[in-house]
């Protein structure tokens, strides 16, 4: 029978390797800090496009794909001012104390403006719960704006019965007038600002009043913008 031979030197090396594998990460984690958290739009809770976050000379990528989470590693413990900047948002800064290990700091970015906003185009769709409105922002090139923050906006409108033929028509009686509640659709590409006029607000003669003209004004921090839809359907599709 062969006897197994145990080499003390090998055992010592193995023990040292195991200890180093366990202790080094703990030592590094204790010496350096990691700052992580969520960075979102203050109103919508969506990820912020092209945000850059800086702590103690460490920064995220300037043009990273928009996600809510971020992290910065290898930061020596101490006092810092965390700064975050993004196009069309107000700058964010917060004094933080970084300790060894993980430090959670959430960032809420307040929208400043819609870039190069020149006009709006509004589309309507008659749904089960009412007339839904989709607001699209247009820039100086006549293109739809896709990257913009959520802002505090107000929408007002007047809905008129449409009288006449498809080619020749005028405004009839006033059906609805006043504020229209807006909501945010995170999944939309262009029209993330939407609104709904519930059928309960629309009192009409369903036999004779089929179409309407809707005059809209959107109040924004950059001024008022108007649009008219002249073929609003007054019935559910």
Question: Model-found features: residue ranges?
Answer:
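Short, acidic Ser/Thr/Gly-rich low-complexity loop/linker segments typical of extracellular
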Residues: 47-74, 173-191
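A short, solvent-exposed loop/turn motif at the edges and junctions
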Residues: 83-95
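Hydrophobic beta-strand segments
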Residues: 51-55, 82, 150-161
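Beta-strand-rich domain onsets/edges
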Residues: 4-34, 106-139, 146-152, 235-237
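A glycine-anchored, Pro-Gly-centered beta-turn/N-cap motif
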Residues: 68, 76-79, 101, 151-154, ...
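Short beta-strand elements
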Residues: 223-237
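Short strand-edge motifs at loop-to-beta-strand transitions and within beta-strands
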Residues: 68-71, 92-94, 103-105, 193-197
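Structural motif
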Residues: 36-50, 138-145
């Amino acid at each position: 029978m062969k006897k197994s031979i145990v080499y003390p030197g090998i055992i010592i090396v193995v023990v040292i390797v195991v200890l180093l594998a366990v202790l080094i990460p703990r030592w590094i984690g204790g010496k350096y800090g990691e700052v992580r958290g969520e960075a979102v739009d203050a109103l919508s809770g969506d990820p912020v496009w092209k945000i850059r976050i800086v702590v103690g000379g460490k920064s995220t990528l300037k043009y990273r794909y928009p996600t809510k989470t971020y992290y910065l590693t290898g930061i020596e413990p101490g006092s810092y001012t965390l700064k975050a900047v993004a196009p069309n948002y107000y700058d964010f800064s917060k004094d933080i104390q970084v300790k060894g290990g993980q430090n959670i700091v959430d960032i809420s970015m307040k929208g400043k403006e819609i870039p190069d906003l020149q006009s709006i185009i509004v589309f309507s769709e008659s749904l089960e719960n009412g007339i839904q409105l989709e607001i699209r922002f247009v820039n100086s090139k006549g293109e739809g704006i896709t990257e913009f923050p959520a802002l505090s906006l107000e929408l007002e409108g007047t809905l008129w019965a449409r009288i006449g033929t498809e080619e020749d028509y005028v405004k009839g009686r006033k059906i609805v007038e006043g504020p229209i509640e807006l909501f945010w659709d995170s999944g939309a590409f262009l029209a993330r600002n939407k609104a709904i006029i519930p059928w309960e607000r629309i009192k009409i003669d369903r036999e004779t009043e089929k179409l309407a003209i809707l005059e809209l004004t959107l109040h924004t921090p950059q001024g008022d913008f108007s649009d008219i839809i002249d073929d609003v359907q007054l019935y559910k599709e």
